[in-house]
Amino acid sequence: ILEQEELDALIGEGAEGLVTDSTDDVRGGGEKYDFASQEYAVSRLIPALSQVQSSLAEGIKQQMRQWVPSVDNIRADRIAVMKFAEVMRSTAAPAYIVSMRADPLGSPIYLAFEAELVFTLVDHFYGGRGRSQHVRAQDFSPSESRFMERLTESLMPAITAAWHTAVDINPVIDEHYHDFRFVDELQQSDTLMVTRFTVQIGTHEAELMSVVPWAADRKSTR
């Protein structure tokens, strides 16, 4: 769990990722913590976020079951630190991506559902067995998009509860995308903390992904 001083530095004014040897002129704790250092991230930020993502897996599972009772399990993989360019290359389009404003975090956070998961969820919801006829679609159908809009909106309380272990946020969906290339809030060189979740629905497995910008502290609203 991050200490209050660390949270203030991460999300508040003065969080510039700087390190100083003097603590007399530290304002809000921002200069005490080098958020950009790998050592700091491994020792503090990633463990805190790992707890968030473990809670998120359980919360999403419970909420998804309200829509698709055959969702058996969701398991979170280890957090991977990746450049946005890598995320774009490794995420096939279409994917159902939601950008969420998460005050008081200083930058959006994201959930991305791979196409196979979208097709399987929609097929089960409408009474099928998850045997989607889609091999590779250029985009989602209107009914698939409407279903995912409703599903992702219903996940907001689960996201709030999961983040409560680290910081209280109020997530609100800002945008929906079907391709990471159209996410204009991120630059290719931006560093992200990425967690993949494997969703088991009957005999099918598919993935969704949580994306948290590493540099949220440097993008905080002033």
Task: Please describe what each predicted stretch is.
Residues 1-222:
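N-terminal auxiliary interaction/assembly segments of multi-subunit proteins
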